């Protein structure tokens, strides 16, 4: 058996890849699967001209359904020492050595393309946090834990009384800030600030044991990101905090939801620059994006968010909002031996 790359433009091959991916997700936790729809994964894999693209890999015999599949987030413009990957074995074929065999070839794929380190992301379901097989499998294959995030879910719709209470408590702490909102496209006035916030996020956000990525962002890359989200069929709901004195954006928060499958809205990036923390900007922005979500009228049932266990301030905000633990996301890292 060999690993081979899938062309997402070939419907039959992509469907076979996605079938294994989806079965693995549902076997882990049917109620809390990651929620990526096939057209969303495909959009990320087709965008070959962008600064980043997802490579889809399958493992098995050519002409037969794959026994396992993988994703590799490939960056072109950023001098990143590692690539983030995922590996999913078909649930009916687990414990036969396919995961180990595929992992070896996945490591080779990353190393052969100039990266000295690999990161494998694993999501644990609500009923297996701390007990899932990856906790043994990864160390046995030379991996150490780079970071662990907790997933929390917030029931929707959000109680109006709680929203008003939190707003009244938090707003007085942010007198020198204005909360701005928009959907889909960043206003031109704020495009450079928005790019800067995303560029510095890897160094500003807390990670346990991962070398921060250095990312190059400008207005054009922000626009490309927004176009990709639109091609996925997702609403992009954004709040940002403007520091009145400096007239610059110092924080932002993104909430997304699929228009075709709106059961779960997902909190994507949220960042408050270190110099502006302590003013409850994270909570105020989350309330603002939830107001935008309410205006979409989509039949959402919950909002899901992931926070590094090191990010205690944002965890505290989510718990004050009423979010409850629903799973975990682990990033396993390994330094690859040179050939």
Residue locations for each model-derived region?
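Short amphipathic alpha-helix that is part of the acyltransferase structural core
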Residues: 1-51, 57-59, 65, 169, ...
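Acyl-donor-binding surface of acyltransferase catalytic domains
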Residues: 104-189, 329-334
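Conserved acetyl-CoA pyrophosphate-binding loop and the N-cap/start of the following alpha-helix
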Residues: 93, 97-105, 276, 280-288
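Conserved beta-strand-loop-alpha-helix junction that forms the acyl-donor binding cleft
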Residues: 91-94, 119-133, 273-277, 303-315, ...
